[in-house]
């Protein structure tokens, strides 16, 4: 029973840390809206917890935080760019200590740069197929 309680306490701490990292990421990444005008990052927050509403190229989107099990029963965070229809356009995984999963560095090393990567990934996902495929003339 003691081991289960310790594991539950650890998972709760990791969950809290992931939530705090997401909040800090959103606060720091918001400066990107001042540099580029292809997306709008509102100052007010009407979004549910662990998410952030914004617009990308005039279309409503949401930045969502999800948690998922990782190696050795650790909890990982997953930031997702989600379109209005619920499609996940881009995502970025990280551990509770902020270490990124699929690239070097930490989540808070350069939040505006990471958000820009996510946004560009989201735009690329929604490119019409005829623009992606080169048609022979």
Language-model features: where?
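Alpha-helical context
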Residues: 1-5, 9, 55, 95, ...
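Terminal low-complexity, poorly structured segments
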Residues: 7, 28, 53, 111-116
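Amphipathic, interaction-prone secondary-structure segments
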Residues: 36-88
């Amino acid at each position: 029973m003691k081991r289960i309680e310790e594991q539950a306490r650890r998972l709760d701490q990791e969950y809290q840390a992931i939530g705090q990292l997401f909040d800090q990421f959103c606060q720091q990444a918001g400066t990107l809206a001042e540099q580029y005008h292809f997306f709008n990052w509102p100052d007010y927050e009407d979004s549910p917890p662990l998410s952030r509403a914004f617009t990308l190229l005039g279309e409503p989107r949401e930045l969502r935080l999800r948690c998922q099990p990782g190696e050795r029963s650790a909890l990982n965070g997953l930031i997702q760019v989600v379109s209005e229809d619920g499609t996940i356009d881009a995502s970025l995984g990280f551990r509770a200590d902020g270490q990124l999963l699929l690239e070097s560095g930490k989540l808070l090393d350069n939040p505006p740069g990471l958000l820009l990567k996510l946004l560009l990934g989201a735009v690329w996902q929604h490119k019409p197929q005829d623009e992606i495929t080169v048609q022979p003339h």
